[in-house]
Amino acid sequence: RRRLRLEALLGFRRTPTQSTPFFRRFKCAALDGHPTPMTPFVPVATGASGVGDTSAVGLALAAMDVFGPQGPRIHILEGEGGMTAGRVHEALATAATAGLSNAIMHLDWNQASIDSDRVTAEGDKPGDYVQWDPRELLYMNDWNLIEAGDGSDFKRVLAAQKAALSLDNGQPTAIVYRTTKGWKYGIEGRGSHGAGHAFCSEAFYTAVEPFEAAFGVKLPRFEGEKTPDRVEAAYWETLLAM
C-alpha cells in the first residue's frame, strides 16, 4: 500500500485514493489504466498497445520449451488498435518463425479506438491508423487464420474455437471476430471508449434491463445525495445483486 510508481512520483499519472468504508475495509488500491499483475488473475501487463502480445508470445515460447506441442495453450486477447504497434509485428513474426502452435490469438475487430471509427483499412476504404486489415497482417506473418464472423453469435464463436483446436500444422492460430464496440449499451464506436452512462441514470438502467429480465433480478435504484460513501455503497449493493 506504500508502493508508488515512477510516473506517479514524476506527476505524469494521477493515482487516486479515497477514504470510503469499503475502500478501507478491503485495503483497495486504485486500478491502473491497463490491467497489470497488481490485479488478481492478470499474469502479465496488458498495455499500452501491444505490450500484452509480446509477453504472451514469451509465455507461449516458454510453455513450448518446457511442455512441448501437447502442453498448455496460451490464449491472447487483442483488438485491431493494439496491433498497430511495431512490437506486435515483431511478436507475430517471432511466434510464426518459432512454430508456436500453442499460441491462439482472439482478435476483437470492431474498428473503433479512442478517436477513430476506422482504425484499419477495410475493402476499398483506407484506415485512419494503418493501411492493412488485421486478417492480412496475420496471414502475411504465416499465422493460421479463422474468420468467426459475427462475434456476438456464440455458435459462430464456439465453432471457430473448435476449429482452432483441431489445427495441427505447427503454426500459431488467430481467430477474428467482427464486433461492435459498445454493443447494446447505448453508446457505440469511439464514443464508448472509456465512457459510460451517468451514475444510476435512466440510460444506465435501460442498458441493464436485458440482464434484469434474463436473470430475474432487480438492481438497486439510487436516490438522494451522491456522497462518496453512498455512491460506494450503491456500487456494492449492485455487485451483490448481480
Language model features: what each stretch is:
Residues 46, 82, 86, 104-106, ...:
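Conserved acidic/glycine
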Residues 1-98:
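Cofactor-binding active-site loop characterized by glycine-rich and histidine/acidic residues
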Residues 70-73, 101, 169-172:
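Short coil/turn segments at beta-strand junctions that form active-site/ligand-binding loops
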